[in-house]
């Protein structure tokens, strides 16, 4: 899912850092899985209030699985933030539909690509 949703980044970049990223997520993140039988079809990672990763297997995308994973962490957290590549228009739209706002931008040192910093707070419906 990483390669298909980030096709603007060279596959060699992901492959070069795959092991270190996996080790980091396993050591630092709470990881919540979406499964179908024994198959993992998606996951969301949570490190404190950051969502560093949300992926759904390509054949299971657009079925609400990513939304359910995100809604779960929104249920257990009052505030979340994440970074998303500026070129990943589908992800930006997805997060905006879930109440995230773009609050800043930065350059990812791993890829050299611009990212938006997005923020979500459990805001009351009425003031």
Regions found by a protein language model. Name each.
Residues 1-22:
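Conserved GNAT-fold acetyl-CoA-binding loop/helix
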Residues 28-42:
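Conserved beta-hairpin
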Residues 47-61, 84-85:
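A short, internal acetyl-CoA/4′-phosphopantetheine-binding micro-motif in the GNAT/acyltransferase core
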Residues 62-75, 93-97:
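Conserved acetyl-CoA-binding loop-helix of GNAT-fold acetyltransferases
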Residues 83-85, 101-117:
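Conserved catalytic-core motifs of GNAT/GCN5-like acyltransferases
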Residues 116-127:
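Terminal substrate-recognition subdomain of acyl/acetyltransferases
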């Amino acid at each position: 899912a990483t390669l298909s949703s980030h096709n603007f980044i060279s596959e060699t970049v992901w492959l070069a850092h795959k092991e270190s990223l996996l080790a980091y997520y396993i050591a630092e993140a709470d990881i919540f899985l979406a499964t179908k039988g024994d198959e993992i079809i998606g996951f969301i990672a949570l490190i404190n209030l950051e969502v560093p990763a949300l992926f759904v297997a390509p054949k299971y995308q657009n079925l609400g699985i990513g939304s359910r994973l995100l809604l779960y962490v929104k249920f257990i957290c009052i505030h979340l933030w994440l970074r998303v590549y500026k070129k990943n228009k589908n992800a930006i739209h997805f997060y905006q539909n879930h109440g995230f706002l773009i609050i800043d931008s930065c350059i990812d040192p791993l890829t050299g690509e611009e990212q938006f910093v997005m923020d979500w707070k459990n805001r009351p419906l009425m003031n």
